[in-house]
Amino acid sequence: MALRISVLGRGAWGSTLARLWSDSGHQLQVWSRRDGNDPATLLHDCDLMVSAVAMAGVADLAARLAPHWPRDLPLLSCSKGIDPDALCSAAQLWQRHLPGAAIAVLSGPNLATELEQGLPAASVIASSDQALALRLQKQLVAPHLRLYTNGDPIGTEAAGALKNVMAVAAGISDGLGLGANAKASLLCRGLAEIGTLIGALGGRSSTLYGLAGLGDLLATANSELSRNYRFGLRLAEGCDETEALQRIGATVEGPSTARAVLRLAAAHGWRLPITEQVVGLLSGEFDATRA
């Protein structure tokens, strides 16, 4: 059955998802902040709301939409990161504003450019509401995107957020020409660091080795289609954070996520050494060769 899907965010990811599901026969409407339109208009005649905005825009958008949210409208959160003020994930932000809403998370090794090209991929729909996850899995099936489900949205979002930081570190490693041994060691320890965050936040250890954990890390930390990886390459070339972001020319979640996660770690006594090094480099404490 065709769904009426509203997508918040017309960036690369939101646009890709909209085209993917439109090609699968669903009815799509897409909102962008640049349009100047009231996002609440998307709540009407809608079966599923999809949030694909950058992390920096989630809190404001959730607050604006909460007073108008239909009781039975589910939300699929597709943003990856940690809010620097609330120190929580995108779906958790939405849940705070919509305490009664059914919410799921979409995450996995999904480089938007490859999906646009019709290349195959797989992703996870995670929710504490198993019935919702299974329903969305069936409804959102697409020719080139296979969907799985899990019941661990906390671990899924933690992995999706911190892998961006690891991708920055991987870009630095490759940009400095440190070799395959160093890269493999970095990703191995990066995976362990993601596991530390998942466990500390109450997620499941099994999530670490699935599509949302290892799968997403491998894709993001090894491809120049990844903005976070390219950002790391620019840092290795000697760019500071501002210049590197300017050269990317689009949202890069890694820097903000690294700082937010490190604040969480400091408050709770968690040890996240790679994240610490990335933040130290961003703050100018040392250059990429020393990190």
For each feature predicted by the language model, list its residue ranges:
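Alpha-helix C-terminal capping/helix-to-coil transition sites in glycosyltransferase folds
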Residues: 44-45, 162, 214
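NAD(P)+-binding Rossmann beta1-loop-alpha1 motif at the extreme N-terminus of oxidoreductases
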Residues: 1-48
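General beta-strand structural signal in soluble alpha/beta enzymes
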Residues: 77, 102-107, 147-151, 209-210, ...
